[in-house]
Design a protein with these regions (language model features):
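Pyridoxal 5′-phosphate
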Residues: 1-375
Length: 375
């Protein structure tokens, strides 16, 4: 049931999503199957519209945002494009509560690119890395720091202004993974100014898989030489003199061969929907429902691992279930009642969004109370 949908940290729903997605894919099929030469014009225009929507979300300038398959591929594209001195012999800083896929990537690249991966650990028994611990580890030896704006396992939100200010004083490149709050909490790549940002179109944006994005600040674009390059990396893709390659002056240098367009095209209706919304109202709705979930957790004596202060959390509420309530079983039982949630270990993840209602939230709470009493 849509009113008991709590998976905005995962996929995301909005009214008429099924109909919009069906229409978008049918229109693509009609264009791509037509016996004329209009296919690429149609597909690339949709991709450009997708990028424009993301630029508005990020307050990013023209020529600074491009598509990627996912967050990990966007991050790899950026890392592999940096000048050698940016990473070689230096440290790359990341928190232990980052998206694990990004950590897997960094661990695999460290030896090849000559940097030392420094992972800021969790304190004993903690669910997220404390800002002060991350700042203490951020010394002038750090060539690049990847900030996780909101953690996927706790919904802890960092003090981005303080982090970026400190990073600037250390002379580091600063990137931000905004995946877990993009589209819900306002984000501006220029305030505070970061060197790059990565995200997906899933979750609060309600898009489809494969529709990742990469933002790179103009100054860093100028210094970057992306490793995978191809005809779309050029200012003029139809410059086919094989001895005269030159990177495009803007984010297009991060494109390479013929670009994939279907994920962007399929996600565009969701981004169009999002652009029409009152964004303050979307956040206020989430805050009302998350406040109720936090109060209910206290009533049920379920440990809250998400920070209580609104300024220190994203849009999710995450609870640590006791061993008497195996999380996987709880998720399955809730699913049987038409309530959509998920878990990581014994952490139950709850993210109410536009389709979730207060009545649906009360339904979830009652179900959890009943399951708790039966345990």
């Amino acid at each position: 049931m849509s009113d008991t949908y709590f998976l905005y940290h995962s996929i995301g729903l909005y009214p008429e999503k099924t109909a919009d997605l069906t229409t978008a894919m049918a229109q693509f099929a009609q264009s791509w199957g037509r016996p004329d030469d209009g296919q690429w014009g149609y597909a690339l225009d949709k991709r450009a519209q997708f990028v424009a929507r993301w630029r508005a979300i990020l307050n990013a300038g023209e020529g600074t945002v491009t598509t990627a398959e996912n967050v990990t591929s966007a991050f790899h594209s950026l890392l592999a494009a940096l000048p050698a001195q940016a990473l070689a012999g230096r440290r790359v800083l990341v928190g232990a509560d980052c998206f694990p896929s990004n950590h897997f990537l960094l661990a695999g690249m460290a030896q090849k690119y000559g940097f030392t991966l420094h992972t800021v650990p969790l304190r004993q028994g903690a669910a997220f890395v404390e800002d002060e611990d991350f700042l203490a580890a951020w010394t002038p030896e750090v060539g690049l720091a990847l900030l996780t704006w909101v953690s996927s396992t706790s919904s802890h939100r960092i003090d981005l202004d303080a982090m970026v200010a400190h990073g600037r004083s250390m002379g580091s490149l600063i990137g931000c993974d905004i995946t877990q709050a993009a589209g819900l909490i306002p984000y501006d790549v220029t305030a505070p100014a970061v060197d790059f940002a990565i995200s997906t179109s899933l979750k609060w944006m309600c898009g489809t898989p494969g529709a990742g994005v990469l933002y790179v600040a103009p100054a860093l674009i100028a210094a970057a030489q992306p490793e995978p390059r191809g005809w779309f990396s050029q200012d003029n893709p139809f410059s086919w003199d094989i001895n005269a390659f030159a990177y495009a002056p803007d984010i297009r240098r991060f494109d390479n061969g013929t670009p994939g367009t279907i994920a962007a095209l399929a996600s565009l209706p969701a981004l169009d929907w999002h652009a029409r919304q009152d964004h303050a109202a979307l956040l206020a709705h989430n805050r009302r429902l998350t406040a109720r979930l936090i109060a209910a957790a206290d009533e049920m004596h379920l440990p809250l691992i998400t920070p209580r202060a609104e300024a220190k959390r994203g849009g999710s509420v995450m609870l640590r279930l006791p061993e008497t309530l195996p999380a996987a079983q709880i998720v399955t039982q809730l699913r049987g009642l038409g309530i959509s949630t998920d878990a990581r270990g014994q952490t139950l993840r709850l993210s109410p969004g536009i389709m979730t209602t207060l009545a649906g939230t009360e339904t979830l709470i009652t179900a959890l109370q009943n399951l708790q009493m039966r345990a």
